[in-house]
């Protein structure tokens, strides 16, 4: 059975700032069938990319990536915001649609040569993906794909990564 995931995404105007339409994935997470279907579709994608490990950026990447890793029986590595990891880290800065931040990963989180699929809720300007990919590559991993619940195509994030296969459940163009 195919699910229309757009039915499970709430569009919230002027959040977190005026002029932004926030695409809220929590209705997918709240519906067991939709959540399982989204997880399965992304897991099938990651399997097709022969992923050894899933990396998810904080915070919603944890919600997307962890169940995918469980379904595939592979590891999950969190890319965290600053000062959340207790051991030695590698860090990368990035810009968002409405701010900037830093992501960190433990220096031993990715083994050299591991095939990595990045999982997150949304691809917009691709700042988060850029920082996540940079960290993975610095640690010796190979990004073989990226999967998102939502892609905002007008922001052209995909175009910044011609060398990465990108999958999204839902695409939005315009407002």
Swiss-Prot record:
Claim: Transferase is one of the keywords in the record: yes
The Gene Ontology CC terms held by the record are:
cytoplasm
* Protein role: Catalyzes a salvage reaction resulting in the formation of AMP, that is energically less costly than de novo synthesis.
Q: Which GO terms describe its molecular function?
A: adenine binding; adenine phosphoribosyltransferase activity; AMP binding
Gene3D superfamilies the record matches: 3.40.50.2020
Q: Which UniProt keywords apply?
A: Cytoplasm, Glycosyltransferase, Purine salvage, Transferase
Q: Which reaction does it catalyse?
A: AMP + diphosphate = 5-phospho-alpha-D-ribose 1-diphosphate + adenine
Please state which protein family the record places this protein in.
Answer: Belongs to the purine/pyrimidine phosphoribosyltransferase family.
Pathway info: Purine metabolism; AMP biosynthesis via salvage pathway; AMP from adenine: step 1/1
Where is this chain primarily localised?
cytoplasm
Q: Which InterPro entries match?
A: Ade_phspho_trans (IPR005764), PRibTrfase_dom (IPR000836), PRTase-like (IPR029057), UPRTase/APRTase (IPR050054)
User: What assembly does the database describe for this protein?
Assistant: Homodimer.
Q: What is its EC number?
A: 2.4.2.7
User: Which top-level group of life is the source organism from?
Assistant: Bacteria
Instruction: Report the protein name in the record.
Output: Adenine phosphoribosyltransferase
Instruction: State its location(s).
Output: Cytoplasm
